[in-house]
From Swiss-Prot:
It comes from the Eukaryota. PANTHER family: MITOGEN-ACTIVATED PROTEIN KINASE KINASE KINASE 20 (PTHR44329:SF288), SERINE/THREONINE-PROTEIN KINASE TNNI3K-RELATED (PTHR44329). Its EC number is 2.7.11.1. One of its GO terms (molecular function) is ATP binding. Residues 508-773 form the Protein kinase domain. Keywords: ANK repeat, ATP-binding, Kinase, Nucleotide-binding, Repeat, Serine/threonine-protein kinase, Transferase. It comes from Dictyostelium discoideum. PROSITE patterns: ANK_REP_REGION, ANK_REPEAT, PROTEIN_KINASE_ATP, PROTEIN_KINASE_DOM, PROTEIN_KINASE_ST. GO terms for cellular component: cytoplasm. CDD domains: PKc (cd00180). This is Probable serine/threonine-protein kinase DDB_G0267566. InterPro entries: Ankyrin_rpt (IPR002110), Ankyrin_rpt-contain_sf (IPR036770), Kinase-like_dom_sf (IPR011009), Prot_kinase_dom (IPR000719), Protein_kinase_ATP_BS (IPR017441), Ser/Thr_kinase_AS (IPR008271), Ser/Thr_Kinases-Pseudokinases (IPR051681). It catalyses: L-seryl-[protein] + ATP = O-phospho-L-seryl-[protein] + ADP + H(+); L-threonyl-[protein] + ATP = O-phospho-L-threonyl-[protein] + ADP + H(+).
Length: 844
């Protein structure tokens, strides 16, 4: 029993484009305009019979019945069918006639009779004379280009297509085979294929057909009892879907696509790894603007020069054809991605030739998708310096302020990707600049340095025109001059690659004493580490032999988190005989921040922001450690050191813990300086947000250090040194800033001192807000800086006197408070424990 399909196509002017899109098998693949374009002229209703198939799925039948007439016609030929395409081209080597394949060869015997055609002795009955003539013409044409398939399968698609297009009688109708004897094998191997709705995916899965065809042609594959087998039935069910997939895969349908999704798929599919089996070649391509190509002049590092010139030119040619057919090469899909986004995202390091071709044909390198990512984001995320160079050469902007995080992805996976991304990242990892690309702040801060360092280390500045390179430097200077100085310094003095145990050391080698604290003494020393001389600060600690392991573990945790924002730890020496431990640290000659803000008088808020951004950078840096966020638990001004370049670094990780559930119990042990502890930390539950509270106290200190006119109180409650505590925790009191402090800054600090840890901003949010505060300052510098000269001494003293009275009143009522606000009040009382009545709620 034959199944008949009665189909027709309406006039293109009357096509219901909405209905076409709603019913189309691959919804987001073809635009309305394209469907209308392909349905050109009204067709007479035609009848199709598909062999003796009885098992065609009704759903498939309806879809086939609907979609195929939009760009091809059907004709019945004795239980078989022929598709006559209007514009599309497809090339196969078989005709199926009554379940038998008729191979098309260079020497094909075709006999024409009245209403009959004999092909290699097999009869085909054709009643319509016009159909018969078209059929014969196509057979002759196919036999004359038998070498097409070999040409096509060896990567010469363009030559193959051009060889056909040059023929006088170009094909407009071709016979489509069903491949009955071997298609079933493919269905079995890709048994889930028929479940897919996207023809592009189907097309990919059918690529294996080339190998199977070869086996059939060489009699290497035989299917016994095929008509009654599961394979045979699977074939029959799959034919309509298979035909559709082949139409998409091998035709010019790609470059007719208006909404760019097929172009994106082409970019994904037609690529060859430019590093694989290729010799180094320089490539140049210059063409007129009319052809939508811009000049390429990339004579640079080997990574770029490995791009195959042949493939590059082929892609340029293909994309030029796309543009000539009004395809928008910068069109966005529903995710906002362009062809350039998808090429880099899907192909990663294999995308070189395609990226260069897209850019040379006018692709915009600075278009953002719906997640605000530009192509440069993906190139950096996948760590491919070659693609970064290509993008930069075509005008990709290296500053990415509006970038978002990679937080939707597993940070561990991204970290592994970064570790596999080549020599540049290895260098950056040693320096510690680019180890955390997966979080917001790191993308903002490290993208620029990644590009700069990559260029500097590879000595490839010639890749960029001077104006582009100048733009990079200007943006880096304007946006983060502190970090840029730090990077340059690291380039001059590369740090030691690993924290290690020092085998030989004599205490007599120590230089002058430069510091002393409750935990030990600090000496200056110049020490040679395997040929690298370092100016060190050596911390001498008296350690009980039973605690050495625990102390070393803490030191190791610090070493693991080393970056340009942490005081470097070069190594340690254990004096087992005298129970001393010597920690070799980076020397910071400008001392700690506490001493600086006590001894020096700030003249403007420029100095405040310089230090404020420094402490925020440092805090965020340890919070975004790739091995797990590191909770410092003892953030205070004296633990921020300032190096010879006036860059702020964080040190003293003696109480630090990595933030993970396995270590939660270790965070319950009280540690840190009492006056800087957050409410929850004082209860033995330290979190990352506890560090934010302490950071807020440091910013508070920076504000308190502003020398108002005749102002002698460098810190809040500065004259009440007998108090061991000056602010409450939880829902008690919090520090009070002087009212002269500008509102944007005081709002930020108060948000960091929120009694509820979950309402405090993250370190990155602190950075963002501080940047906005700085912008407010930049636009009102005169007003902000005027507070240095406008505070009257009486008014200033009255403000502090009122605060003193309130504190004294609280003491009188026996409301025990938990912490003084400044280090100066508890320099010698770091280990004092206070009893706190948390049932009492106090407010000013």
């Amino acid at each position: 029993m034959n199944i008949k399909f009665d189909m027709f196509v309406k006039d293109s002017n009357s096509i219901d484009s909405e209905e076409l899109l709603n019913n189309y098998l691959t919804l987001n693949v073809v635009s309305q305009e394209l469907l209308i374009q392909n349905a050109q002229k009204p067709l007479t209703p035609l009848s199709i019979e598909i062999g003796k198939t009885r098992t065609i799925n009704k759903n498939i039948k309806s879809k086939l019945n609907f979609i195929m007439p939009s760009f091809c016609e059907y004709y019945e030929l004795e239980g078989n069918y022929i598709l006559y395409f209007k514009k599309l081209k497809i090339f196969e080597d078989f005709i199926i006639y009554k379940d038998q394949s008729i191979p098309i060869s260079n020497q094909m015997e075709i006999k024409i009779g009245k209403g009959k055609v004999l092909v290699n002795g097999k009869k085909i009955s054709i009643k319509d004379e016009e159909i018969k003539n078209n059929f014969i013409r196509d057979l002759n044409f196919l036999s004359s280009i038998k070498n097409f398939r070999n040409q096509y399968s060896h990567g010469n698609e363009i030559e193959a297509v051009e060889s056909i297009s040059k023929k006088e009688n170009s094909i407009n109708s071709l016979v489509i085979p069903t491949f009955i004897k071997f298609l079933g094998e493919i269905i079995i191997k890709t048994k889930d294929t028929i479940k897919f709705k996207n023809l592009m995916v189907l097309s990919d899965n059918f690529n294996i057909l080339d190998d199977v065809i070869y086996q059939v042609e060489n009699n290497e594959l035989n299917l016994k009892n095929s008509k009654n087998s599961v394979v045979y039935k699977s074939i029959k069910k799959s034919i309509p879907i298979y035909l559709l997939s082949k139409v998409f895969e091998h035709t010019e349908f790609y470059i007719l696509e208006k909404n760019n999704s097929i172009l994106n798929f082409f970019c994904k599919k037609r690529i060859e790894d430019f590093n694989e089996n290729s010799e180094d070649k320089e490539f140049n391509s210059t063409s007129e603007n009319d052809s939508h190509e811009s000049s390429i002049d990339l004579k640079c590092s080997s990574e770029v020069s490995q791009i195959k010139i042949e493939r590059f030119h082929e892609y340029v040619s293909l994309f030029s054809k796309c543009i000539s057919k009004n395809v928008d090469i910068n069109h966005k899909n529903d995710k906002g991605d362009t062809a350039l986004h998808n090429t880099i995202k899907n192909l990663k390091k294999e995308s070189g030739p395609m990226v260069a071709a897209l850019l040379s044909c006018g692709a915009n390198a600075n278009i953002r998708n719906n997640k605000h990512k530009v192509p440069l984001h993906f190139a950096i995320e996948f760590g491919d310096e070659s693609i970064i160079k290509i993008l930069l050469a075509f005008g990709a902007k290296p500053f990415l302020e509006d970038s978002i995080s990679f937080s939707e992805r597993d940070p561990g996976k991204i970290y592994k990707e970064l570790n596999k991304s080549g020599q540049v990242l290895k260098i950056l990892y040693e320096i510690g600049v680019i180890t955390k690309l997966f979080d917001n702040f790191s993308v903002l801060q490290h993208v620029k340095t990644f590009i700069l360092l990559e260029i500097l280390f590879q000595n490839s500045m010639n890749i960029l025109k001077s104006d582009i390179f100048s733009s990079i430097l200007n943006n880096i200077f304007n946006q983060n001059i502190v970090r840029f100085k730090l990077i340059i310094q690291n380039l001059k003095e590369p740090p030691l690659s690993k924290f290690k145990k020092i085998e030989k050391f004599d205490r007599s080698e120590l230089g002058k004493l430069i510091g002393k604290g409750a935990n030990g003494k600090v000496y200056e020393l110049h020490y040679n580490f395997g040929g690298v001389e370092k100016h060190c600060a050596v911390k001498e600690i008296k350690v009980d032999k039973y605690r050495v392991g625990a102390v070393l573990k803490e030191i190791e945790s610090t070493a693991l988190s080393q970056s340009p924002f942490t005081v470097g730890i070069y190594g340690y020496f254990e004096d087992e005989k005298n129970n001393f431990l010597y920690i070799f640290l980076e020397y910071c000659p400008n001392g700690n921040l506490f001493d600086i803000i006590n001894k020096e008088k700030m003249k403007s808020f420029d100095e405040f922001f310089s230090y404020a951004f420094g402490v925020v950078h440092c805090t965020h840096d340890i919070h975004s450690n790739p091995k797990g966020a590191l909770i410092h638990r003892d953030i205070k001004a004296s633990n921020f050191l300032v190096d010879k370049n006036n860059l702020v670094k964080i040190g003293d990780f003696g109480t630090a813990r990595f933030d993970c559930t396995l270590n939660l119990s270790s965070l319950k042990n009280g540690a840190g300086t009492v006056c800087f502890q957050a409410p929850e930390a004082s209860r033995g539950k330290a979190t990352i947000q506890s560090d934010i509270y302490s950071l807020g106290v440091v910013l508070f200190e920076l504000c308190g250090a502003i020398p108002y006119k005749n102002y002698n109180y460098f810190f809040p409650f500065g004259d009440l040194k007998y108090l061991r505590v000056a602010s409450a925790v939880s829902n008690y009191l919090r520090p009070i800033l002087h009212p002269v402090i500008p509102q944007p800054l005081s709002d930020l600090i108060y948000s960091m001192l929120n009694h509820n840890e979950y309402d405090r901003p993250t370190s990155f949010e602190v950075f963002q807000k501080l940047k906005k505060v700085q912008e407010d300052y930049e636009s009102n510098k005169e007003e902000w800086n005027s507070i240095f000269n406008t505070i009257d001494m009486k008014e200033d003293q009255q403000f502090h006197h009122e605060r003193q009275e309130k504190v004294a009143l609280m003491i009188k009522k026996k409301y025990l408070l938990t912490r003084p606000i400044t280090e100066s009040l508890v320099n010698h009382y770091d280990n004092i424990v206070f009893n706190i009545d948390y049932s009492i709620s106090l407010n000013f």
